[in-house]
């Protein structure tokens, strides 16, 4: 077998195995009712960085290996879509409600060839994201900010700002002296 064909075969095999691992993660592992097992799998096989006392509930859906970091005492509730191809960084004491969608990839609509692109999403400490909110690629949610349920965040949010709507716009402010500790884990989620 020529060297080029062998390298091509190895690259294809690696891609197929990577896709199989993601399929197994999203269709089997994320249905296991044990935080310990899921978190261990994510750390070892997906190479995620997961802080202590953080929880990722069942049916969280990931799009890639690596590119995912969550700090201490943070929670991602059930059925969240986490497109980590461009990188997702989540701080400490962050609460992400059910069915939130965080996207890090899109297409350049001004490009004649519909170029795909990735941009990271950064969620700083003490952020709250309400149910079914959508966070788009390239957004930073500043420390202590809050996103209302159903909001679509298209631009970065300053610290301690509350946003709501489609597209999300500022509607208020949170206190700047936040000091709570999130320790939320349900037994079978």
Region locations from a protein language model:
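Flexible, glycine/small-residue-enriched loop-and-beta-strand segment within the central core
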Residues: 28, 32, 38-39, 58-70, ...
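Beta-rich strand-turn-strand
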Residues: 131-155
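Acidic, glycine-centered active-site loop in nucleotide-sugar glycosyltransferases
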Residues: 158-159, 164-167
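Short conserved AdoMet
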Residues: 51, 140, 158
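A transmembrane-helix-recognition feature enriched in membrane-embedded lipid enzymes
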Residues: 2-53
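Leloir-type glycosyltransferase catalytic cores
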Residues: 185-189
